[in-house]
Structure formats: structure tokens, C-alpha cells
Amino acid sequence: MNAPAKFSTSQIRSDFLAFFEGKGHTIVPSAPLVPGNDPTLLFTNSGMVQFKDVFLGAEKRSYVRAADVQRCLRAGGKHNDLDSVGYTARHHTFFEMLGNWSFGDYFKKDAIAWAWELLTQVWKLPADRLLVTVYHTDEEAFELWRDMIGIPESRIVRIGDNKGAPYASDNFWQMADTGPCGPCTEIFFDHGDHIAGGPPGSPDEDGDRFIEIWNLVFMQFDRQPDGTLVALPAPCVDTGMGLERLAAILQHVHTNYEIDVFQALIGKASALTGIADLENKSLRVIADHIRACSFLIVDGVLPSNEGRGYVLRRIIRRALRHGWMLGVRQLFFSKMVPTLVELMGEAYPELVVAQETVARALLAEEERFAETLDAGMKIFDDVASRSQEIIPGADAFRLYDTYGFPVDLTADIARERGMRVDMEGFEFAMERQRETARAAGKFGGGVALPADLVATMAPTVFLGYEAQDADALKVVALLKQGRPVDRAEAGDEVIVFTDRTPFYAESGGQVGDSGQLSGTDVSIEVADTQKFAGQFHGHVGRIAEGALKLGDVLSGGIDVQRRGKTILNHSATHLLHAALREVLGTHVQQKGSLVAPDRLRFDFSHFQPITAEELAVIERKVNAEVRTNHSVEVHNMAMQEALDFGAMALFGEKYGERVRVLKMGGYSTELCGGTHVSRTGDIGLFKITSEGGVSSGVRRIEAVTGQGALDYVAEEERRLGEAANLLGGNSTEIVDKVRALTDRQKRLERELESLKAKLASGATADLGASAVDVAGVKVIAVRLEGFDAKALREAMDRLKQQLGDSVIVLAGAAGGKVALVAGVNGSPTGKVKAGELLGHIASQIGGKGGGRPDLAQGGGEDGPALATALQGVPSWVKQHLG
């Protein structure tokens, strides 16, 4: 039997797309690893994710046939292969899925015929090495394989409901308990009888002899709530074929880690770590994880302590720990990126564009974890040595909280040693910390609308895009002290819900409007407007006069000046976001914001501090767009239309079928439901007031606009002038004068240190003569005015050299505080411990301290007790010398 032809991974990709393009398919780019509009899914884990809305009928595409190579990730959440990666032949965090799709066009006959043609005629796989499965009642697929393709019945396996329920089968696909579903047929490659394992459906099907290549799903039914299947009017086809396992077959190797892409990455990891054994499992882990980490960063995810960013952090740290296991103590992981770009950059140009960003983000995380990895491993070793089979949950939490060890990393290490982590104990410790954080963060009780009340209300109609005041606002709900009421009176604190309102409810970072509601004989001062249940605007305020009841009709007007200042800041955040992405890179994503009348705050993903030069460029770019005075356009459109329009959606946000797109010239296009200026020039001036870190991988910029920015600049100029006056010059001379002042200060500090050293030298010479002899040991316990801890240590060293066998206590007093140093030199060290002596003294002056047997440090309060404590030192020493 002739061996099949050999194909590179790159050629397999291009062959697949070219083949289906020739069959009339539109070639669709891979979707990002972060699903664009599915908050229920952590990562894109299959080819069908980007077409989900098409299959559900919620979206129409311009084509009915499609083919793609989809990058996928399975790590975290329901689909998690992380623990198996590196230890099995075919598990990966990142993988590529080849797929062809029919949306109500061709069906089983063409799907089966084309799959067979590609496998046997293009890639030359021997037909007698292929086996197929079908759902046990799918006679159409069975007959197509037997009669059209010519596969013997002995190599067509019927698979029934093998998962304990009707239609619960390896060969029946369903998106959920109801909705589109249908049978599938799978194609397997037979590695030969020299490999252990049986065919699918047999007791030993989990062996490695028969490997699934391709799954063809035929969506032909709509499953009803009662479990019955109704035929779909336009059946669809969804196929998926794992590139890595197909490449293993076409390259004549048995594991995915032996294919060309992985061999190149493993080779690079080998060179960086100095490990020559290319089958080493840790090298496999590193090779797998560099792909997952790099493409996550390409798709806008950065390491953090929550959500997708935390999954990325876990994968990076797992790779770093495997490097540590190999004895690597230098930074290495980010150096894998150029090799990955060489291998996959042609297929994914976005990887080439983001290469520098990927390398910098990985390096920053590598440097961060390197600081705690060694210490954390020592803690783990200590815990493991004291435990039999279980790592206590409290210790696993300490490794997570203090040393940055994700719990699955700790579990990974434990498993290698035949141990396990007490996950219940870990979750208990984690929840206890969450409760502490929640308690610390509480500033007032939350109020929710009762479900029965929500059921009777229609979503509030927001009028505030066009109007600042409105009449005929009907009161549809009224809360007092968090409970629904029919009536409230003057002095009552209330939340008023009307059917319509010009008041913006806090969302998207923009604060809620304040203002006034009024009606016949009633006036309500609105301090804030909040959104309840995502769709009801609640006016939070106090009834100033009169009484209010359900059904009343009100007029309302917002605080126009407050709203005016707020919209300047909101529009500026959009320009700032665009400028950050232009200057720092497209990895920048909004992570949070506050848009208030007096300032704006913008949190974003970035892995290192922003330099002063970068900050200046960002500010200049925003102000340039302000001066350009672009018209601000608002468009309402379907979600997909908005994305095609170039609108930026925020990762993790859930959007409706129709969205509001805000466009500022050609500079910024984002989805946004907030209120904004008409032209960018309305912002006037944009001024950054601060920049700093919020958490790992998240930075924060605060800024002011309009009159607030002018006021800020004026205050800065006033302070500059005041500083110039203090320095005896004008503002243009400040830098030179401050530099001269700093140089003078440094010179004086050096002179002061020199004088202190001379003083200490002279003082120690005099002190030596005052030593008390206690059983042949010289004892000194004195107070030294103006001596800090450093000067005390220097004096201690001189006295030890001068006195020989000695016990010395020095107290430096300054500003009501006392620094203490105790030393034991020579023969007394066996009986007198410096740490115990210092603790004895410190306890008498309201302080504490400790240290080694020969040297200890501490401190306390200055006062009469110090003299008494020092006077008692000779007696204490005598007692301990025996």
C-alpha cells in the first residue's frame, strides 16, 4: 500500500479554502477568539460560533455557502482542555478548525461528496483507511456513503443514543434543549492494527487507532419543548475538521506535537531552555501555550485578574512554571513570538501587525511572575512536605492571593506529585475574601424593582437625545424606602418612574441627570437618575412640596448646565480611546469609565506605564481632533451593519439587535448610548490631569475638558508663578533654579552624612570607655541624640571591633520616636540573644523589634520609660549569663 502524500500545515489550509472556493463558497475570515456578541461564551471554541445567529435566523448573510479556517480556544469555562495539554497526543488550548457551511443551500449529498473528494483526490488519503459513522436512524446518509461513495457497509458504523437520552448521541448535534439540531456523520482515519484501539462505537473506541478527521452536521430539525422534531424548511450544513490532527495524518506522524508547526515551536523552546529532548512534555506545553497566549493578545485580551484576562494569565503562568521545571531562571517565553509569527503570520496577518504588542505584553507578565514564582514554589514544597495527599484550600488560596499562582496551576503541580487540592477549602477562602471586599465597598443598600412590578411596566422612552425638558410624563411606579407605594408626600425620599423622560439614566460610565419634576401642586428635586432592570429610568430625589401619587402627569427638566459639562467629557472619552489605540496600539480596549460634569476617568488595557512623551502625544492628538471641529454623527442600525460600518464594540458588552453608532469625523466610530456634543469643537480643550495603574494590565487616565480644562491650566499657571516667586525668579527660570536647588541639597546631604560619621566615630570612642563589666562581658546601653537607624548600626560595628566580647544596646532618639539596635559579640552569643534583648526593651517603650541572635533592630516611643529600660540591661545580661 502506497503511503499518502505529505502536506505542510500551510498547504492544508490553502488547499481547503481553494477547494471550497472552487465549489462556490465565500471565504470568510476567522472571527476573533473573543466572541463579538455572545456574552454566554468565554471564547470562540468552534467554527460555528460566528455563524450562530445565522442558524438561529437572527442574522442574514450575503452568501449561502461559506468556508473558513477558524482559530479556536478551549481553556476556562465549560470547554477547558488546559489540564490535558502537553500530556496527551491531541489536546490543545489553541487550535484551528477548517469548516464549510451551507445556509439552506446544498445538503447531505454535496457535503458528503465534497468531503470525500477533498480527502481522497486532493490529499490522496487511501479510501481503505477511512471509516465513517452515521446516526442510527439517518438512512439517507448511510445510503449516500454506501451507494454514492462506495464504502463497504462494514466500514459504516451506526451510532445510537449513547449518552442516556433520546437524541443524546455522538452523532446527533443540538445547539440547546430546543432549536436547530440534526444528525451528523463523522469520518475517521485508521492508523492500522499495530495501534491499540477499536472502531467508534466499540468498547475500546478511546484507543488511538481510529482518529476522527471530519464531522459533518446536518441541521434538518427544529426540536420542540416537548422533544419532538419538526423538519426545518431550509436545512443547513455545518462541518468541522481539526487542522492539527489532519496535519498529523497527512504528515505521517501519530501525535499533533510531531507536525511541522509544533516541531518548529518545540525546537525554539528547546533552544531557549537548553533541553534537547524534543518529546519533553514541558516543551510541548510551552509550544502549545505560546499560540494561545499570542492570539488572545492579538484579539484584545491582556493579562488581568478577572474574566478572559485571567484565563490568559493562567495559561502564561502555566507555561512559565514549566520553564521553571526545566531549570530556566531567565526570561524566555516572549522570545518565542518571532518563531510563531514566521510560522503563522502569512495565514493571520493580524499576528504580524501585533507582534510587538504581543511580545511586550508577554514580557511584562513574565517579569511580574518571575518575582514570585521561586518563592511560591518554596511555599508549595513546604506545604506538600507537611501534607499527605491533599493541599489545604487555605494554602492554595495563599499561593493564589500572595504569589499569583492560579489554582489550576497549583492543582497541576499537585497532580504531578500524586496529590490534589482541597477545592472546597479554596472556594471557601475565596468567597470569604469576596465578602470582605463587598463589605468594604458598600456605601448604601441597593434598590431593585420587584419582579411583579416590572411585569406591568413598559421600558422607559428616553427623550433626552433631542430634548432637555418634556411634558406629559406619566408616573407609572413610585418607590419609597425601596418599596412600591401609591402615594408620597413632601419630605419623602422617593424614586419616581415615568413612562417617558428627558433624564439620562446612569450607564456606559455617564452619570445620571439631575433636575426637577413638577406637576399640579407637587415639586420633586431630582438628585440622580438610575437605570433599573436595564430598561427603566428611576428619578432619585426628594419631594420638595405637595404630594405625588401613581398616575400623576408631570413636567420635567434636566440641569442643563450639568448635562452640558457631562457631554463634553463623554465625547472626549471617545477621542481619547481612539488616540490611545493610535499611539499605544490596537490592543488598547476600554475597561471602564466615569463621565461626570467635572471630570472624566478612562480605564483601559495596557501592560506598562505610559511615558510622559506618549502622554503628551495622546493629549495633542485629542486636541487636534477638537480643533478640527468634526461633525458628530449618530446612526441607528443593526449590529452586524454597525460592525461592517467600522464601529468599535466593547468586549464583554451585550448589545441588542439594533445599536446606536457615534461617529466623530474619520477618527472615532463607536457603539454608544450616551449623550454627546454636536461637533468636536464644542469640547474646547482637553487636558490630562493624571495617569496611573489600576490593576495588572489596566491603566487609568483622568482628564478635564472645556471650562474645567481652562480652570485647571489657570491653576497650574498660578502654582507655577508662586513657585517662581519662592525661588526668586520667573517661570522660565524654574527648571534651572530647581535643578540648582536639588544639586545643593544633595551636596548638603553628603556633608551631613560625613559629619554624622565623624560624630559617630567620636561618640563610640567615648562610649567604649563607659562600658560596664558583667561577668567578663562588656555591656553598654545608651541613648544617642539625633542618631537614625543607619548611624546606630555604624556605631554598633565600631563598638564591636573596639570591645570584643560584648553586649551593646543603642537607642537613637528623634522627634518623639526611638530607633533601637542591639548587638551581641563574641562569647556571650551562646547565652544572650540580641533579638530577645531588643524585644525586652522595646516592650517597655510601647514598641517592637527582633532579629538574629547577634543583631536585632526595632523601635518605640521616646519617654521616661526608655531610661529605665536601658538602666536594666546589665541586670538582664547578668541573669542570662548565669
From Swiss-Prot:
Q: Which cofactor does it need?
A: Zn(2+)
Q: Which domain of life is it from?
A: Bacteria
Subcellular location field: Cytoplasm
GO BP: alanyl-tRNA aminoacylation; negative regulation of DNA-templated transcription
Keyword check for Transcription regulation:
no
- Alphabetized Pfam families for the sequence: DHHA1 (PF02272), tRNA-synt_2c (PF01411), tRNA_SAD (PF07973)
Q: How is the cofactor bound?
A: Binds 1 zinc ion per subunit.
Q: What is its main location?
A: cytoplasm
Kindly indicate whether the keyword Lipid biosynthesis belongs to this entry.
Answer: no
- Give the reactions, separated by semicolons, that this protein catalyses: tRNA(Ala) + L-alanine + ATP = L-alanyl-tRNA(Ala) + AMP + diphosphate
Q: Which GO terms describe its molecular function?
A: alanine-tRNA ligase activity; aminoacyl-tRNA deacylase activity; ATP binding; tRNA binding; zinc ion binding
Q: Name one GO cellular component term.
A: cytosol
Binding sites annotated in the UniProt record for Zn(2+): H570, H574, C672, H676
> EC top class, in one word?
ligase
Instruction: Give UniProt keywords alphabetically.
Output: Aminoacyl-tRNA synthetase, ATP-binding, Cytoplasm, Ligase, Metal-binding, Nucleotide-binding, Protein biosynthesis, RNA-binding, tRNA-binding, Zinc
Residues in coiled coil: none
EC number per UniProt = 6.1.1.7
- Annotated function: Catalyzes the attachment of alanine to tRNA(Ala) in a two-step reaction: alanine is first activated by ATP to form Ala-AMP and then transferred to the acceptor end of tRNA(Ala). Also edits incorrectly charged Ser-tRNA(Ala) and Gly-tRNA(Ala) via its editing domain.
Annotated PANTHER family: ALANINE--TRNA LIGASE, CYTOPLASMIC, ALANYL-TRNA SYNTHETASE
Say which family it is in. Answer: Belongs to the class-II aminoacyl-tRNA synthetase family.
Please state what the annotation says regarding this protein's domains.
Answer: Consists of three domains; the N-terminal catalytic domain, the editing domain and the C-terminal C-Ala domain. The editing domain removes incorrectly charged amino acids, while the C-Ala domain, along with tRNA(Ala), serves as a bridge to cooperatively bring together the editing and aminoacylation centers thus stimulating deacylation of misacylated tRNAs.
> Which HAMAP family does the record cross-reference, listed alphabetically?
Ala_tRNA_synth_B
Name this protein carries in UniProt? Alanine--tRNA ligase
What organism does the UniProt record list as the source?
A: Xanthomonas campestris pv. campestris (strain ATCC 33913 / DSM 3586 / NCPPB 528 / LMG 568 / P 25)
Q: What is the lineage of its organism?
A: Bacteria, Pseudomonadati, Pseudomonadota, Gammaproteobacteria, Lysobacterales
